[in-house]
Design a protein with these regions (language model features):
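PLP-dependent class I/II
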Residues: 1-183
Length: 183
């Protein structure tokens, strides 16, 4: 933001402890902007909120007093999970999954007619050894839902073994779905 003064009125940076340190529910973060309009609007909310809960403040302080080892370990773990998930997904016939570079989820194109329909079928009609999976149809993440009609968003927040099992379930589900609906 500082490097591009011509964009300063149109730039907003938002960060939060809940995202940076996986502190679900901790409502501590920051908003950085040079826009007076955005700043004034944010201050209305900030002043109404007063302050975050004490335990959240203590946890956030502790998180900032580390040497970076925690962040490195988390980054390494998510990179490992991402690589496993992307490799396993791309090994399924008809699945295309680019490697994401900055998130903890991937968007994969599936060999189905409609991922909304497929996701519902997974939850209501499919099980492999009494297990199923849930995927998020990607259409809702696009301004034009048709762009994501054959895509799903899959988070890689599970442990490695659970990720592997989930992909095995997906692989079998895709085969059965394509047979059932003659795709």
């Amino acid at each position: 933001m500082l490097a591009f003064p011509e964009l300063s009125e149109n730039c907003i940076i938002i960060d939060s402890e809940s995202k940076r340190y996986s502190m679900c529910g901790v409502r501590i973060g920051c908003l950085i902007t040079r826009s007076k309009k955005i700043h004034d609007a944010a201050m209305l909310f900030a002043q109404a909120r007063l302050s975050p809960v004490l335990l959240g403040q203590i946890a956030a302080t502790a998180a900032h007093q580390n040497d970076g080892a925690y962040i490195r370990a988390v980054r390494e773990e998510y990179t490992h999970r991402r690589n496993i998930l992307v490799d396993l997904l791309n090994a399924i016939p008809g699945v295309i999954c680019p490697k994401p570079r900055g998130a903890f989820y991937c968007v994969a194109e599936l060999p189905v007619d409609d991922t909304e329909k497929f996701a519902q079928w997974l939850l209501e009609k499919y099980a492999l050894n009494k297990e199923t999976i849930m995927v998020a149809p990607a259409g809702g993440f696009y301004s034009d839902p048709e762009l994501g009609k054959k895509q799903v968003r899959i988070a890689y927040v599970l442990k490695e073994e659970d990720l592997k099992r989930s992909v095995e379930i997906l692989k079998n589900a895709l085969k059965k779905y394509r047979e059932e609906f003659s795709l």
